[in-house]
């Protein structure tokens, strides 16, 4: 389900949204393993963005998040710290886009392979074509 807010300057595609009482629950499925505790940091921020979007799109509901890993299910709750982290991450991303400067590339292709931008970051010709490097 596509979630979008011009005011928040956020957009995201969550796997599922369901209503349970006063709660709007975002469900995101991940194929990898779960960390020993909680959720991976990037998954927490991603889910936090979905929760901010749900909060705006469904006023009066309590947004909740569930991340389903291959063998575990973890809950994510929107709190002031996560709200700040999501908005700070959004602001940094907008700044990168406005300045047309990219953060330094991590020289660990194995770590990056799951990223949707992997082929772009590791294609030096494409990066030059876009005006980076």
Identify the residue ranges that each predicted region occupies.
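Short cysteine clusters
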Residues: 112-115, 121
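Short Gly/Pro-enriched loop/turn and capping motifs at secondary-structure junctions
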Residues: 72, 121-122
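Short cysteine/histidine-rich zinc-coordinating motifs and their immediately flanking basic loops
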Residues: 124-133
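Immediate flanking context of iron-sulfur cluster ligation sites
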Residues: 92-113, 129
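Mg2+/Mn2+-dependent nuclease catalytic core
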Residues: 1-92
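Generic secondary-structure boundary/loop-capping signal
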Residues: 1, 5-8, 103, 109, ...
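Hydrophobic/aromatic-lined pockets within catalytic cores
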Residues: 55, 98, 120
């Amino acid at each position: 389900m596509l979630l979008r807010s011009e005011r928040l300057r956020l957009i995201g595609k969550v796997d599922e949204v369901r209503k349970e009482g006063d709660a709007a629950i975002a469900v995101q499925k991940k194929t990898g393993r779960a960390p020993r505790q909680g959720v991976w940091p990037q998954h927490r921020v991603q889910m936090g963005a979905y929760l901010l979007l749900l909060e705006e799109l469904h006023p009066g509901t309590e947004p909740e998040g569930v991340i389903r890993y291959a063998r575990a299910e973890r809950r994510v709750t929107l709190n002031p710290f996560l709200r700040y982290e999501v908005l700070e991450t959004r602001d940094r991303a907008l700044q990168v886009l406005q300045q047309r400067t990219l953060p330094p590339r991590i020289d660990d292709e194995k770590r990056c392979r799951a990223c949707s931008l992997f082929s772009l970051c590791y294609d030096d010709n494409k990066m030059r074509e876009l005006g980076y490097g």
